[in-house]
């Protein structure tokens, strides 16, 4: 039976890392089928002490703690992958709560798809205390909402799993060189995203199909008080910065095509915003348009 190395990159989530570990500890698959590696990426909020206390009260299973001082999720995830013992790598966030059959369904998917090299699952936002009235389906991707299809299927070209719930074989991960550290994620107050997209595009370029399985579920904690305009700008512009770095590394032509794509998406956002207003949901209009403006600004280097 395949076994899983679950890698949790953590940065200042002492309030949530315990819940993430609890969910793994209670997996229906049993503790013998996976290991969990917490990679602390320079936390300053007592995360090491939280892990030590948690481990004292949960001595069974294979749960490990390590550090990575180079700031950014790509560095931390690569560190976790280097020390992982098993043939499959699963990456989740430090505020992601895995459903009880999470590991069991990952193993089942691997057994059902013997030639699979990468796949991902569903991500459900867990809003605290409640979903904001201005949140829409199109903006919710910024807080991790991901529900690609109602049944297991292959991703279409241009689609891929999100970083909070993705699984790759260690062999293919090492073959492509892991996560691109030129797309590190969050470094200080600057976000340069797209590391998961870059990873899966490289796997696809090798001729492999990426799959989606909606039974592999995590809930992503979203504190609505943190969803300020400044926060949403950092996330959206970070997506654009990541695409700027990724496409420019391919060619100037790829970068120009991405600008055209983003302009098209901005136009679509304007139409969607008008539609929300006409439907009596004007609170959703501004955020969906601002999202596309901010991603375009990041793409253009602003």
Feature locations, PLM:
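Short, well-formed alpha-helical segments that are part of the catalytic scaffolds
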Residues: 13-26
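Glycine-rich, basic loop-to-helix element that forms the pyrophosphate-binding segment
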Residues: 68-84
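Conserved donor NDP-sugar-binding/catalytic core segment of glycosyltransferases
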Residues: 101-135
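Short aromatic/hydrophobic "clamp" motif used to bind/position activated sugar donors
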Residues: 89
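A short, conserved alpha-helix in the catalytic core of glycosyltransferases
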Residues: 163-168, 172-177, 183-216
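Short, flexible, basic/aromatic active-site loop/helix in glycosyltransferases
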Residues: 121, 138-159
């Amino acid at each position: 039976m395949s076994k899983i190395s679950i890698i949790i990159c953590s940065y200042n989530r002492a309030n949530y890392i315990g819940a993430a570990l609890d969910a793994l500890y209670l997996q229906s698959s049993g503790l013998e089928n996976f290991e969990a590696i917490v990679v602390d990426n320079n936390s300053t909020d007592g995360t090491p002490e939280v892990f030590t206390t948690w481990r004292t009260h949960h001595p069974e299973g294979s749960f490990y703690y390590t550090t990575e001082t180079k700031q950014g999720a790509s560095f931390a995830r690569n560190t976790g992958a280097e020390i992982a013992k098993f043939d499959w790598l699963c990456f989740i966030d430090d505020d992601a709560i895995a459903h009880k059959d999470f590991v069991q369904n990952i193993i089942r998917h691997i057994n059902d798809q013997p030639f699979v090299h990468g796949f991902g699952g569903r991500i459900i936002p867990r809003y605290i205390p409640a979903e904001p009235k201005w949140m829409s389906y199109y903006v919710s991707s910024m807080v991790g909402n991901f529900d690609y299809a109602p049944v297991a299927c292959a991703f279409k070209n241009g689609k891929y799993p999100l970083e909070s719930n993705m699984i790759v074989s260690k062999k293919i991960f090492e073959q492509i060189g892991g996560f691109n550290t030129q797309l590190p994620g969050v470094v200080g107050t600057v976000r340069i995203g797209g590391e998961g997209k870059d990873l899966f595009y490289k796997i696809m370029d090798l001729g492999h199909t990426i799959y989606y399985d909606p039974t592999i579920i995590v809930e992503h904690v979203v504190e609505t008080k943190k969803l300020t305009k400044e926060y949403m700008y950092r996330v959206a512009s970070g997506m654009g910065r990541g695409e700027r770095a990724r496409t420019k590394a391919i060619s100037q032509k790829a970068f120009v095509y991405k600008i055209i794509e983003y302009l098209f998406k901005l136009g679509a956002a304007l139409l969607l915003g008008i539609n929300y207003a006409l439907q009596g949901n004007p609170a959703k209009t501004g955020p969906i348009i601002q999202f596309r403006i901010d991603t375009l600004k990041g793409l253009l280097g602003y």
